[in-house]
């Protein structure tokens, strides 16, 4: 809207309206002036830009002209390239046709040469040359030959005749080669066998060649294996390896089959084609024969080593042991057998008789596992270097299937089962024998049983590792855990359950002692001494056994990692589960140690502490200065008490293992604080009596701390706090120890507020009203 239109729309009938309108016009004029000034200020910039645009227009005309020229050149180049490309395609087509024509000519020439040469070679029995001609003929495209004959007038008859000649020659050569190969096999002419084996793929008989050659090798290996098996004992005797005679024969059999694959793999790859399945075909045939030879060997092994008879003995013995396990506590050690009842007479298999057999079985199983790994590695290298990637998985899967379904694998599973049966029997019976023959000399802390038992167990586990079987190793570890948790732990617990013969004995322990004396005969005067020594020795045995198990677990983890470096997650979980079972036995042994220590507590510590602590009641703790001086000048209670404790601990110091001795001191400290607290509650104190008690508690704590490498501070905390309460000068001093702003260690107090008040009432110089007013 213009200014005039705005003026026309305004009402200017009065002076005020005229002034208002004039003001609006002035404001509008000011705005217009500001815009004009802003535009005029940009005049130089606008003129500079317009000048630049003018200069650029001339350059744009030049660019437009050059762009048009470039476009014309590109169009011409594209047309030229399309023309050249068409000519190149026509030239390439012509070259391909010329090459095809040349190939047809060469095929025709080779066809005639081969048809003529093959007849001559067959007549001269030059099978290599005839096979070469046939291989060239088989490599030709038969349909292409016929099209060539149709295209070349007058040649169809000659081409057909040549093809017919070569086809007949191929069949004839195949028959002759097979016949000559069979004759070479009958004549045992290895050179001729290998000669014709290399000719088979040239005439297109890859499968036939592999089968015939593999069967020939199988026959040779079978004859050799039978001869060696008949002379196995003589060979082993000559080599001083009678105990490993059959393991050595098995090793020789497997090495022979593995050597055949290793030696002939390059020949097969060179003559039968790298990408073919000829090698896996040979492995399949050889494996079948290997199964047969190993089966014959194991039959002879089972017969001469009396495996079935010994297994039957083991099973019967196991059943009898299981039946005898229900005899309960009446079972005693007799005839070297822990679980065998007294007077029993059982014809049992001596573990030493099967020790050598077990060792031989482990060697046999390990050799088979090594054979499987070797064959897998040879096939893996073959497929990775020679077989197309898309076929590698199929060939390896076929190999795994062959080995998985082989009779050798099944027989190894059976022999592994036999091994586990015999190994378990050997381990359990050897452990029981070690327990039955347990001896210890005076001054020793442990008996011979611990070292003997763990030597046997380590031997069994390491022997299991040599089988190269994860399942077998896990089974043996589980058997070790069961053996320890059963016979071994029971043997340790038996004397501990009877209690420590110290003269302080409860009714249950007395009953057990009477039962034992009735079973073993009249008690002699030294039976108590032997019982005490045996109790402590078995307690030490249990303690040392926990250390042995920890060492055994650590050693096993290292040896397992070295024996089975590439384990699956499932196999790793199996091994970890077995080790967990073994560690659970360690916990059971710790519980046995705790049980034995509690027996010492009830039989030795508590009965002896009671009269000593009662002496505390004979000393007054309401003292004046003269009585305090007289008390300190004489033998104080704590001096008497420490002498008694020292004598008690010294009687066990050389008999207990360091860890058991520390545990005994810890139990003693606990019992001392409990009984001393009871005694404190029975008497009253004054200020000097509380001071004496505090000194006595400190001296007692210092002695017990110095008597053990373990910390007994926590066990003395409660009694120390009681002594602190009774040693207060004034009842108001308690706030310095109790209030959190004054004592940052308030949470370490082991006394409740009610207990604090109770002990403060023992001070006869503290008023009950003041004690009740305490804010705790």
UniProtKB/Swiss-Prot annotation:
Keywords: Golgi apparatus, Membrane, Phosphoprotein, Protein transport, Transport. Pfam families: COG4_C (PF20662), COG4_m (PF08318), COG4_N (PF20663). It is found in: Golgi apparatus membrane. It comes from Drosophila melanogaster. One of its GO terms (cellular component) is Golgi transport complex. It is a peripheral membrane protein. The modification Phosphoserine is found at residues 342, 345. GO terms for biological process: Golgi organization; intra-Golgi vesicle-mediated transport; protein transport; retrograde vesicle-mediated transport, Golgi to endoplasmic reticulum. PANTHER family: CONSERVED OLIGOMERIC GOLGI COMPLEX SUBUNIT 4. It comes from the Eukaryota. The keyword Glycoprotein does not apply. InterPro entries: COG4, COG4_C, COG4_M, COG4_N. Belongs to the COG4 family. Component of the conserved oligomeric Golgi complex which is composed of eight different subunits and is required for normal Golgi morphology and localization. The keyword Iron does not apply. Required for normal Golgi function. SMART domains: Cog4 (SM00762). This is Conserved oligomeric Golgi complex subunit 4. Signal peptide: none annotated. Transmembrane segments: none annotated.
